[in-house]
């Protein structure tokens, strides 16, 4: 590969070229029939992940936790949750991952911890405790007519209701942007930061991890004084705190400090990658986070494309959108990198998103497989580090027509309760909320992995176990690893082919630059070009159930059809008509 001086982003790195497979440990594979996935279960399926063509695994939180938010409420950063196994099980998993030639990435949840963490127990014990300032404690703003304490400001929790919880013992509120058992850590306190680095980062670096996915990494720096947020949702007394909590005044300083800690801690020469979850940021802010010369993050996750079609006031309200909106939002993931020393990520699914075929494709029996393959064609053609979430490679779809009682996610439950209290169970607000969660709830991604059509647990647990969460009934319809591995036309086998294509053409698929839309306003066609050295990649993707026409850029005869989601025997490479949900990638040299 030729590194272009005009495109420093093309400097090769393992974490740029890797396809990273995300594992949600509770739902991946249960080895001991207690209904929960575990470390030994993951270890038993590493060969499956390797054979898919992925190069690294990222495991969502496996630390000791009360599990109020599925492990994103950590009580001990240096201990594996016993249900998942022991620390030794985890060390063995890291070793096996490395023996198979893959990297091991773990989740870093350090904006907040669990209220069961010793740090918080000490902090809440008295107003004079040395760790009191490790969290955000504030007196009530006042008391209402019934004598109840009023929260210090109007910030809304991401999970509904106020972002403050009152502590009876010391008669003060503590800040928790998520659920009431997830108190926010005060990064302004240097002793607190040092403890975070040592316990949550240093311990796992010492045990061989290759990188960290940094949970809500834009929230560490809160604006001094914690002022009231502007009112953008007139229907609620609680408002989004983003202007005062996201990408705050010291956020880059904090990430540089943590990055320096990582570089100083690792003595064996391995290069550690970090990927920050940065929900929304301007292009300039993204460049500040990921510029190699600034030593903050390797890359980041942006939510522009997954938030399309949802209200900025409240994500669990759906709003209309067109393909053009999604195209533009998707390009926001990587266009800021062009001609810089920055880097980006490409993804459609994770533990916080629904199934992409339901969300952006067509999950009907007729079009599920072909539209799932189309999304794969799109992903492997875009520049950046590619992430694949467990079950995505099977073409999993959202569960259908589940009552609210079957939902497990604390975000759904808390918002349901808040809307019920504020507007009523039969209100229009509740109707909109229920419509939204059927499409975008996080629970769609969290059902147990579908390994086979074995009743009743799809091979996730033994037949006599009771899984921690309901299974998606689609495992009975052929959406499972065992059936798909035997079917040459399955989504699973297509993903293997797609990842081979991406690796074979990594110069232009992974590192390609100068991305340009073709026919951006087209409501059915997603088409673009990008370049690398003397090569040009042209993609034509039909996001509809109709046949549509397209044109090759400049009608050039130099473009050769290299990849697509219909069998090559069914495709006329000279045709300029795409079948329903057909995607093609052409390359000219």
Curated annotation (Swiss-Prot):
Gene3D superfamilies: Glycosidases (3.20.20.80), Golgi alpha-mannosidase II (2.60.40.1180), Oligo-1,6-glucosidase, Domain 2 (3.90.400.10). Keywords: Cytoplasm, Glycosidase, Hydrolase, Maltose metabolism. GO terms for cellular component: cytoplasm. One of its GO terms (biological process) is sucrose catabolic process. GO terms for molecular function: alpha-1,4-glucosidase activity; alpha-amylase activity; glucan 1,4-alpha-maltotriohydrolase activity; oligo-1,6-glucosidase activity; sucrose alpha-glucosidase activity. It is found in: Cytoplasm. Its EC number is 3.2.1.10. Belongs to the glycosyl hydrolase 13 family. Present with 166 molecules/cell in log phase SD medium. Alpha-glucosidase with broad substrate specificity for alpha-1,4- and alpha-1,6-glucosides. Not required for isomaltose utilization, but overexpression allows the IMA1 null mutant to grow on isomaltose. This is Oligo-1,6-glucosidase IMA3.
């Amino acid at each position: 590969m030729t590194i272009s001086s005009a495109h420093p982003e093309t400097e090769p790195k393992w974490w740029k070229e890797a396809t990273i497979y995300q594992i949600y440990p509770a739902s991946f594979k249960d080895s001991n029939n207690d209904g929960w996935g575990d470390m030994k279960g993951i270890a038993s399926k590493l060969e499956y992940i390797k054979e898919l063509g992925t190069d690294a695994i990222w495991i969502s939180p496996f630390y000791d936790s009360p599990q109020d938010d599925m492990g994103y409420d950590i009580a001990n950063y240096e201990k594996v949750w016993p249900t998942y196994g022991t620390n030794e099980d985890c060390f063995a998993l890291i070793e096996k991952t490395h023996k198979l030639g893959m990297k091991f990435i773990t989740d870093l949840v350090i904006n907040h911890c669990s209220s069961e963490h010793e740090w918080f127990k000490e902090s809440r014990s008295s107003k004079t405790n040395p760790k009191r300032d490790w969290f955000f404690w504030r007196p009530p703003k006042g008391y209402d007519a019934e004598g109840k304490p009023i929260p210090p400001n109007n910030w809304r929790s991401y999970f509904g209701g106020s972002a403050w919880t009152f502590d009876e013992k010391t008669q003060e509120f503590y800040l928790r942007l998520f659920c009431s058992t997830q108190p926010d850590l005060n990064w302004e306190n240097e002793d607190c930061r040092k403890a975070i680095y040592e316990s949550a980062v240093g311990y796992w670096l010492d045990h061989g991890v290759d990188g960290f996915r940094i949970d809500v990494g834009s929230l560490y720096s809160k604006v001094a004084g914690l002022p009231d947020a502007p009112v953008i949702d007139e229907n609620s007394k609680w408002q989004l705190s983003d202007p005062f909590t996201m990408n705050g005044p010291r956020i880059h300083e904090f990430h540089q400090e943590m990055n320096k800690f990582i570089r100083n801690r690792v003595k064996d020469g391995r290069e550690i990658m970090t990927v920050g979850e940065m929900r929304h940021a301007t292009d300039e802010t993204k460049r500040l986070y990921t510029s190699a010369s600034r030593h903050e993050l390797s890359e980041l996750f942006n939510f522009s494309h997954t938030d399309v079609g949802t209200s900025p006031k409240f994500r669990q309200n759906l709003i209309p959108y067109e393909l053009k909106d999604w195209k533009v939002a998707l390009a926001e993931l990587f266009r800021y990198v062009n001609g810089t020393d920055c880097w980006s990520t490409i993804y459609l699914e994770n533990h916080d998103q629904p199934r992409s075929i339901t969300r952006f494709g067509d999950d009907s029996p007729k079009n599920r497989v072909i539209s799932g393959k189309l999304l794969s064609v799109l992903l492997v053609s875009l520049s950046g580090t590619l992430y694949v979430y467990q079950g995505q490679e099977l073409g999993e779809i959202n569960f259908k027509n589940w009552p609210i009682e079957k939902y497990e996610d604390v975000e759904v439950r808390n918002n349901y309760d808040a809307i019920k209290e504020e507007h009523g169970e039969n209100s229009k607000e509740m109707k909109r909320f229920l419509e939204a969660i059927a499409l975008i709830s996080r629970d769609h991604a969290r059902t147990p992995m579908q390994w086979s059509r074995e009743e009743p647990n799809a091979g996730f647990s033994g037949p006599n176990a009771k899984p921690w969460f309901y299974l998606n009934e689609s495992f009975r319809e052929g959406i499972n690893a065992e059936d798909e591995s035997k079917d040459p036309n399955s989504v699973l086998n297509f993903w293997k082919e797609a990842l081979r294509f991406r690796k074979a053409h990594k110069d232009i698929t992974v590192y390609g630059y100068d991305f340009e839309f073709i026919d951006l306003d087209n409501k059915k066609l997603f088409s673009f070009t990008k370049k690398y050295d003397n090569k040009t990649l042209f993609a034509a993707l039909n996001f509809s159930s109709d046949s549509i026409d397209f044109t090759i850029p400049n009608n050039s005869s130099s473009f050769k059809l290299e990849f697509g989601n219909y069998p090559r025997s069914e495709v006329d490479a000279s045709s300029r008509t795409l079948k329903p949900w057909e995607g093609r990638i052409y390359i000219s040299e």
